[in-house]
Amino acid sequence: MEVTLLSLLESDLPFLIEVRNDESTRSQLGNDSLFTLEDSTQWFKKEQPEWLLIINHNLTRIGYMRIDGDTIGIDIHPNFRRKGYARLAYQKYLEDTDYADLWVFEDNHAKKLYEELGFVETGEYETLRDRKYLKMIYEKWK
């Protein structure tokens, strides 16, 4: 099993919205708002994000990687969760990265994955929707 990371294109936005607006995705994000395709298209054209599409060996869209400077995160389509795709995508991305950070709710199952990948808690957190939202960092040289 392998994944490929490709630049997210405007034509991928309907897929992004399908994943992003799923309740199981939104519940784990700092911003749990619903977005329309129109909202996303305007955002995409204005921000020109360096986000990545995650595809599998069959060229099926699996999810996407959010990148904002050093801050990263992955959202996987519900049909492909718990199959190792997020781990593979993070590993591929981190191969060429010395530092990255992310935010995760303390009760998110993915926190264990982040720890296994080498992310550590910084002690910094926010309280969102009555839950702790923790900052974790990855430093290759440690």
What are these regions (language model features)?
Residues S24-W43:
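Conserved GNAT-fold acetyl-CoA-binding loop/helix
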Residues L102-E115, F119-V120, E126-K132:
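Conserved beta-strand-loop-alpha-helix junction that forms the acyl-donor binding cleft
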Residues F44-L53:
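A short helix-loop-beta-strand connector motif used in the catalytic cores of GNAT acetyltransferases and
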Residues M1-S11, E139-K142:
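Conserved N-terminal entry element of GNAT/NAT acetyltransferase domains
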